[in-house]
Amino acid sequence: STADAGSFLTDQMGEKDLEGFTLRILSTTENKDGGFAFGTSQFIPDENEPGVVSDAIMERNNLIEQTFNCKIDVQFTAAYEAFVQKVTNDYIAGDIDYDVIASGISSNGLSALAASGYLEDLNAIENSYLRLDQPWWDQQAVNGLSIDNKLFFINGDLLLTDDERTCMLFFNRDLIEENQLEDPYALVEAGTWTVDKLYEMARAAAVDGGDGKMDVEGGEDTWGLIGAAFDTYKMVLGCNAPMISKDENDMPVITMLDEHNVAAFNKVYDMMSDKDHVAYLENYYRWDDWTNGEKFYNQFYEGRALFYANLIGSLNKQSMQNSSVRFGVLPLPKYEESQSGYACTIDPYAFTCIALPKTGAGNLDKVTFMLEAMAYYNSEKVVDLYYETTLKLKRLNADDNKAEEMLDIIFSNRIIDLANIYNWENCIQYYNQLLVNNSGVVSFLEARKDALQNAIDQTVELFRKLQ
């Protein structure tokens, strides 16, 4: 019965009558073939994407609404700049008619709204029901996204499109066998999956189709690794080398010029700039040339690339669904074997978090209660379904008994770099620029360090003034 099912929630949350309160969520809409298949159904059932995950969300909402006498309402708006502009306009007009916003956390998403002072500090809400130290909230994000102990957005089991925007590598299992290469899964488990090993295997698998040159047009060449220029940054993060770290006072500290970070960039640069074995999109086409971009990435789906740097959400793309390639999933490689663990960064543009806009409505206790209930429910009832149906059984091969273990490693080793979130001085493009013209990483970064520090200081000062 509903009452029996509701006891599962009340055992955790306690009895509460929310007196018909409606939780109003504003979320962004995305292109589902771009890896955003759950942008709708993580909040409400999606009529266009039926399945067990959508059904579980419907059951969650019904149970919470009946158990606590409340309602869940979701409205959708365009993403990125349009989303930021809508919230900004509504805030200035005093016309915010939603309690929760959900979007990516980049500088054209939630971090822009935080830097404008429009969001509640989740660590400072009186009578909050959010238990952010619990495992259904992403602890890497709780610790990584704050500045000066102020936390403006968060993710966890409440959301699905955060996991989908986590960076990793696909690999072609058939090419591994054909080239008699080491099993990447065994390397990951042994802690020996490194950039050097990735590069070694990429060189071994790359094959010229017979015309004496490697290119992406003829359809005959096989590449060791394909990706985009921005994968340089992601791989450096995989070496546990963030551009910006935090000190003991939770303050941002520039670390991009640390010896380890410079060495990590140089190692990744040597691989990414090897045009005989590695192909990145921008070396052939513009980053926003979607037609040729699709053709470029089809090299992996057609079996002509050993490794493919992308995001978990690519599993939902039609090209991946239709591919006959037997593929596996891997975390980003370490800098060296002695690195303590793997590190997988995020795509901030659509790595979804939730935030609470400042409304002055005085209902944050009810808002946080419902969010906590939804997150807890998902941790118990939805996350496993998402894993099994979407990430594993939906597309990963039935004979791949290591994929779910790899997903656990990827998701439990997310690394948050504040440079990736706030993009002060367009710093996340630094490595892309060096990939095109490497005049020396140290001198390049030194010339930009002061301006970067000044931009960081301005954000910190703004946050300190917020009440």
Residue positions per predicted region:
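Extracytoplasmic/periplasmic substrate-recognition and gating elements
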Residues: 320-391
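Glycine-centered hinge/linker elements that transmit conformational signals in sensory
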Residues: 199-202, 244-289
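Conserved C-terminal helix/tail region of periplasmic/extracytoplasmic solute-binding proteins
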Residues: 358-368, 378-467
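Extracytoplasmic/periplasmic solute-binding protein
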Residues: 24-26, 95-101, 147-169, 177, ...
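Conserved N-terminal structural module of periplasmic/extracytoplasmic solute-binding proteins
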Residues: 1-115, 439, 445-467
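Paired acidic/hydrophobic, glycine-rich loop segments that form the ligand-binding mouth/hinge
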Residues: 98-103, 301, 305-310
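Hinge/lid segment of periplasmic solute-binding proteins
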Residues: 6-21, 34-36, 78-81, 108-167, ...
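Short, solvent-exposed loop/beta-turn-alpha elements that line the ligand-binding surface or hinge
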Residues: 124-135, 216, 242-263, 337-344
